[in-house]
């Protein structure tokens, strides 16, 4: 709660959040400013005098926790500290208000480490609609019925199972989650063009090292992404 409240205070003070960085110098300068401002706001909250309101829906929160527990129930291996070896996280967002209405950061023992917004993992093919296809459609050059050629790329990715289908529609390429087509599309529209879409959606683990890297098309990021992103 303190973390989110500190960010809210930063927004109220017109702090300019940044998600895309030109280079290391740009990133370092921003992070120095961010950390100083964040620490100041978090300390203000801990000093008292604030009333914090959340958008969490307790019924949805309970349902999400139950669903996570049920899905992972077959995996019972425990670590030495008594926590489950296999963990998970989940978030529900109200798309009308963009508010987080439920957030689950794990299962089992009580844990202050909330994996839903603190832990980053590689998104794999789940990122394709966001960084490849949606930006490509917005260019007007790509549309669901357009044909693209699915073939093996030198120094590029292969498809799951090693199969290639030749000329396929963009719709079919997305349906089959073809890595080669996703790579081709992002390379064609420009990696940084697609990356900027994630910046506009406020993905918070992006780094300057990701700039121009075509493996982003199939979910290969430097830091990964968070569930809440």
PLM features per residue range, with description:
Residues 42-46, 174-177, 207-211:
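Short, flexible turn/loop "capping" segments at secondary-structure junctions
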Residues 130-133, 183, 195, 228:
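Predominant activation on well-ordered alpha-helical scaffold segments within soluble catalytic domains
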Residues 205-229:
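Active-site-proximal helix/loop microenvironment
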Residues 1-160, 171-172, 218-225:
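Extended, non-catalytic substrate-recognition/exosite surfaces adjacent to catalytic cores, especially
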Residues 141-195, 213:
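Conserved catalytic neighborhood of penicillin-recognizing serine enzymes
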Residues 118, 178-179, 203:
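A broad detector of the eukaryotic-type serine/threonine protein kinase catalytic domain
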Residues 190-206:
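Short, charged, amphipathic alpha-helices and their helix-cap/turn boundaries
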């Amino acid at each position: 709660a303190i973390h989110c409240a500190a960010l809210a205070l930063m927004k109220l003070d017109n702090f300019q959040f940044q998600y895309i960085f030109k280079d290391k110098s740009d990133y370092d300068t921003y992070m120095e400013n961010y950390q100083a401002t964040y620490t100041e706001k978090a300390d203000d909250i801990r000093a008292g005098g604030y009333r914090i309101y959340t958008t969490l829906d307790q019924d949805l929160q309970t349902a999400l926790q139950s669903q996570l527990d049920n899905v992972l129930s077959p995996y019972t291996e425990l670590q030495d500290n008594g926590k489950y070896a296999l963990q998970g996280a989940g978030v529900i967002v109200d798309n009308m208000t963009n508010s987080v209405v439920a957030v689950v950061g794990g299962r089992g023992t009580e844990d202050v480490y909330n994996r839903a917004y603190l832990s980053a993992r590689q998104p794999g093919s789940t990122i394709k609609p966001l960084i490849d296809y949606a930006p490509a459609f917005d260019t007007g050059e790509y549309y669901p019925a357009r044909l693209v050629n699915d073939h093996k790329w030198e120094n590029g990715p292969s498809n799951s199972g090693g199969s290639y289908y030749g000329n396929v529609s963009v719709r079919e390429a997305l349906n089959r989650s073809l890595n080669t087509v996703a790579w081709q599309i992002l390379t064609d529209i420009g990696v940084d063009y697609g990356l900027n879409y994630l910046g506009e959606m406020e993905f918070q683990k992006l780094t300057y090292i990701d700039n121009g890297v075509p493996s982003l098309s199939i979910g290969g990021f430097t830091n990964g992404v968070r569930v809440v992103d």
